[in-house]
């Protein structure tokens, strides 16, 4: 099983754990606004790392961003497969075609 799927399983388990026992459980307990704030913070840190041109720092911050995005997905009843399906749908489609397809529904 790949890391994203294992993480998704663990994040599902954390939904039922005590907030003082798990960082992810504490995020779930604090609610959507806290999760969204963390994603914003991690996205900003990723942008700064990229601007600084430090590959190791970019990967580190991107891992934090992906983690918090996975928390959001789980909180919303979604998972990595939902995102991977959407990426698969877009694969081979130009960016302009994809953008136009959003207008169609």
From Swiss-Prot:
Belongs to the PRA-PH family. GO terms for biological process: L-histidine biosynthetic process. GO terms for cellular component: cytoplasm. It catalyses: 1-(5-phospho-beta-D-ribosyl)-ATP + H2O = 1-(5-phospho-beta-D-ribosyl)-5'-AMP + diphosphate + H(+). This is Phosphoribosyl-ATP pyrophosphatase. The keyword Zinc does not apply. Pfam families: PRA-PH. It is found in: Cytoplasm. GO terms for molecular function: ATP binding; phosphoribosyl-ATP diphosphatase activity. Pathway: Amino-acid biosynthesis; L-histidine biosynthesis; L-histidine from 5-phospho-alpha-D-ribose 1-diphosphate: step 2/9. It is an enzyme of class 3 (hydrolase). SUPFAM superfamilies: all-alpha NTP pyrophosphatases.
């Amino acid at each position: 099983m790949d890391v994203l799927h294992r993480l998704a399983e663990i994040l599902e388990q954390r939904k039922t754990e005590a907030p003082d026992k798990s960082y992810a459980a504490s995020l779930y307990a604090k609610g959507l606004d806290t999760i969204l704030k963390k994603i914003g913070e991690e996205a900003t840190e990723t942008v700064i790392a990229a601007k600084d041109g430090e590959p190791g720092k970019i990967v580190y911050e991107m891992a934090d961003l992906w983690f918090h995005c996975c928390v959001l997905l789980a909180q919303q009843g979604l998972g990595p497969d939902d995102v991977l399906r959407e990426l698969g749908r877009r694969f081979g489609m130009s960016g302009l075609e994809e953008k136009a397809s959003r207008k169609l529904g």
